[in-house]
């Protein structure tokens, strides 16, 4: 008997989603997976008034949380930052009694506007992507979540359609079997 994949909450945050071909292509396999909930934050909260209790309930119902967004100013879009600050509150995700996310998994799926070579000591950005991702990794740690290796699509808008299909297939394959050794 095959076990069901764990429930995945895909938090998608892109303020100009209609213009992001790369992110639309990446979302396709997720939208077809029964165990994946795609939650478009900008579609749900165009006014930035986040329903904290609803968001926290979604987190409780899923084992793997995917944060899919473009890299904006070495971070995430503003609404996702607001979401992180408000939803992952003390007493829920951290601090005394804040163990609701303990043991869950965090994976970031990031698109960038620059090539991979820009993310090195001698590159345009002077720091590797692992350094830029550190605040997200530390947030996962604060929430007692397991940090998973991020999926980074460099220079996303300049990727060929074939290359983006390859990334989407790899993403879809991962979504079907997201945990090493299949266990939660």
Swiss-Prot record:
Its main location: membrane. The keyword Cell membrane applies. Its EC number is 1.6.5.2. One of its GO terms (cellular component) is plasma membrane. One of its GO terms (molecular function) is NADH:ubiquinone reductase (non-electrogenic) activity. Gene3D superfamilies: 3.40.50.360. It holds the Pfam family Flavodoxin_2. Keywords: Cell inner membrane, Cell membrane, Membrane, NAD, Oxidoreductase. It catalyses: a quinone + NADH + H(+) = a quinol + NAD(+); a quinone + NADPH + H(+) = a quinol + NADP(+). It is a peripheral membrane protein. It is found in: Cell inner membrane. It comes from the Bacteria. GO terms for biological process: positive regulation of potassium ion transmembrane transport; potassium ion transport. HAMAP family: K_H_efflux_KefG. Regulatory subunit of a potassium efflux system that confers protection against electrophiles. Required for full activity of KefB. Interacts with KefB. NCBIfam families: PRK04930.1. Belongs to the NAD(P)H dehydrogenase (quinone) family. KefG subfamily. This is Glutathione-regulated potassium-efflux system ancillary protein KefG. It comes from Erwinia tasmaniensis (strain DSM 17950 / CFBP 7177 / CIP 109463 / NCPPB 4357 / Et1/99).
